[in-house]
A protein has these predicted regions:
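Mature-region segments of soluble proteins
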Residues: 1-40, 51-58, 68, 72-75, ...
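Active-site-adjacent bridging/hinge elements
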Residues: 47-48
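Substrate-recognition/specificity elements adjacent to catalytic centers across diverse enzyme folds
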Residues: 62, 79, 83
Length: 259
């Protein structure tokens, strides 16, 4: 089973703050133009090099999710971690990595007592997302426009899903949301293309770090080249908002990200 990326719409692209025009998709979005982490692979040990290069050259086949679940989860990921600013050749394969984790049974080593196993949680959660979409818009999630999809996901973020009550009694909404987001972030930022985006020079072993003073790039890294941009007009993610739910969550540390 393959995953196809649809055409990019102008209203899903980040906007240049000065011109007001959409910023076209590029091979490497972010503030580190021209930086290529894989260019440092000769400094890594063989085992590390094999693991990292495989993330680019060998995308896992879909073996856990059904075709319908892949289509739905891909649409969800397109809103949680949009990649419209990347050209088609440099999209990071999030769904295949989640699928591979579930198929091979990898987990963190613990499970909340009110949560089903991760695979079951995903199947239920995806059904729940579609139920909320149909309750709010009388259509499947994949049939909605981006500006309609975000409010559906927002109800999960706030632990107030509008629809699918029976499903959410089996998988707590806030727990599922954290599972979904943590898997998405893990898959995205484990990929060398994401490292290029944030200027991360890759594994330090066996070379080690040289610039131990705070905020300074290593000799093989590049200086940050910031520019002004605004979130896409269809996005609701321009600022951090506290999670809803029964379980306490801390706000993340750090600066605002790239687009």
């Amino acid at each position: 089973m393959s995953i196809e990326s649809g055409p990019v719409q102008a209203n899903t692209l980040p906007v240049d703050s000065h011109t007001g025009r959409p910023i076209p998709p590029r091979a490497q979005p972010g503030y580190y133009a021209g930086f290529d982490t894989l260019g440092q692979q000769s400094f890594w040990d063989a085992a590390t090099r094999e693991v990292v290069v495989r993330r680019v050259e060998r995308v896992p086949p879909i073996q856990f999710f059904t075709e319908q679940e892949v289509t739905l989860l891909s649409a969800v990921m397109d809103r949680l971690i949009p990649q419209d600013d990347r050209d088609a050749e440099h999209r990071i394969p999030i769904v295949p990595q989640i699928d591979n984790r579930l198929f091979t049974g990898r987990m963190d080593g613990y499970r909340y007592d009110d949560m089903p196993p991760d695979g079951e949680a995903y199947r239920l959660g995806l059904q729940g997302i579609d139920a909320v979409a149909r309750q709010m818009h009388d259509r499947a999630f994949t049939e909605l426009e981006p500006e309609e999809q975000d409010p559906v996901l927002w109800t999960l973020h706030q632990d107030r899903p509008q629809g699918g009550d029976e499903i959410w009694r089996q998988v707590p909404t806030d727990r599922f949301w954290l599972l979904l987001m943590s898997d998405a972030v893990d898959a995205y930022y484990a990929h060398p293309y994401a490292w290029n985006e944030i200027g991360f020079g890759g594994p330090s072993y066996p070379r080690g770090y040289f610039r131990l003073e705070g905020g300074k790039p290593e000799p093989w890294e590049v200086e940050e080249q910031r520019y002004d941009w605004e979130p896409p007009p269809t996005s609701t993610s321009g600022e951090y908002k506290q999670l809803g739910g029964r379980h306490p969550h801390r706000a993340p540390a750090g600066q605002g990200g790239t687009h």
